[in-house]
């Protein structure tokens, strides 16, 4: 059952531009925190669609049929200036549908930081879901020019969702997942917003010399280009279950 779990930095909203940030759970909090740190002066409404979580093991057709109607409903209710799809899988699956319906400048997607990675290293390790990998247009545009390795895991996002506050469980799972890539010379792309929440844990396992990249800052930069930045605190409302509030309390100051 959805609930208003948290209100952060609340101030007079009549002066703020509203942004709807959408994810299946806690992953998109990485983007919310980045926007808050930029002091964009935005009214951020974060919607955690736990009813349909996780997205990572769903097909494009399933996401279109089940998630798109929910997005349309919330857009109509909340009237945001823009919506941020804070999920690589959802972006790869439905971003074109939403842009066709609402316009190019209404929808900001989240995509793996493949292009920035290619400027650093032509050998890339992608951590993502199978649906993201299969439907990522940016990846298709550069794949022939890079040496790509991939870890396509459908369970890691759910593990982070469930065990964010239990580091031992998460570390054991990450260790098994990443053990073959310790001290790798490849650039490592975190192709899921959930993974950004445990970026430091991934870094510790792979080694301090391994370059990690994700799309968080790119999303923030686009939001700022579209809506501006007035050096004021953001207001943040979280709509989701208690876990979203709990993770935000820990992650926002990490």
Language-model-detected regions and their locations in the chain:
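Non-catalytic structural scaffold of enzyme domains
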Residues: 4-254
